[in-house]
């Protein structure tokens, strides 16, 4: 799985406003770290990296056309990008309760003759919530329903930005706020998580 993540950051000593500032800063920093070489900056040192020959340790891949996100919950900020599958790789399993939410979301969208988001279940939002639920419930057994997820994630806020420039469907510049896809919008609402817009 190609993705980029950073270590959790304890912000419990900060005011709520400072915590949200850290949420935004961590997201933008992750987008910059995870971005492939900037095509508009010939001096970007990432141009020297041979992506085909470089082995990236897990969670440090360079990406473009992706999403970086951070989750603020109980005084901790965690950051993660969306994920893409490499040859011979599998996507990580989402926490069972969150996987169930995404299955419900897909059924709901298809029942209305729609299509799930392009990154359904692979977006930064899905990985962030799953990672947090796994920290709270490592065995995947005590948080098992939508109500359990809502209780566990009470007060959580999420912020997401574009990695690299996006041309379609809506033009977005690198580092610009990126709203959740149609699948994640519904999933975050079901989980009781607020999408912070900055």
Language model features with spans:
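Zinc-dependent deaminase catalytic domain
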Residues: 1-198
